[in-house]
A protein has these predicted regions:
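Alpha-helical cap/lid subdomain in secreted, periplasmic
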Residues: 1-131
Length: 131
């Protein structure tokens, strides 16, 4: 905020779903993202909220099944964005496979996008930034 950006892009939540820093509920994760958006809005910064990318497993956290949590978090973020007239960038729909994970060709580990994945994401985000 102190750098006074004109726009902030919020793409967050997957590491929290993976419980990388300990257990978190979907509501806790959503509230953290919403708090960031509210701080930006209060400082006249344009907010763009991005969907969490699809994931149906974590190679480093075998016991966690994230697909339903990702969908639930994305729904909360989409509804918040709509109600608050914020841009919502839907990467999920463009990148999901039939088993609710990241399309194999778009990432190496099923979580993080590769170059092909970023090439899918780029025009979607550019459209939101330019609107």
């Amino acid at each position: 905020i102190h750098l006074k950006p004109s726009t902030v892009v919020l793409l967050a939540g997957i590491n929290d779903i993976a419980e990388n820093t300990g257990p978190s509920t979907i509501e806790m994760i959503a509230n953290n993202i919403i708090s960031m958006a509210e701080l930006a809005k209060a400082n006249q910064i344009k907010v763009i909220i991005c969907s969490v990318l699809p994931a149906n497993n974590f190679p480093w956290r075998k016991g966690i099944k994230p697909a339903e949590k990702v969908r639930k978090l994305n729904l909360i973020l989409q509804l918040y964005s709509y109600k608050n007239k914020l841009a919502y960038v839907d990467y999920y729909s463009a990148m999901v496979n039939d088993s609710h994970g990241l399309k194999k060709e778009l990432g190496e580990d099923g979580i993080h996008p590769n170059k092909k994945g970023y090439l899918i994401m780029e025009p979607i985000l550019e459209k939101a930034i330019n609107n």
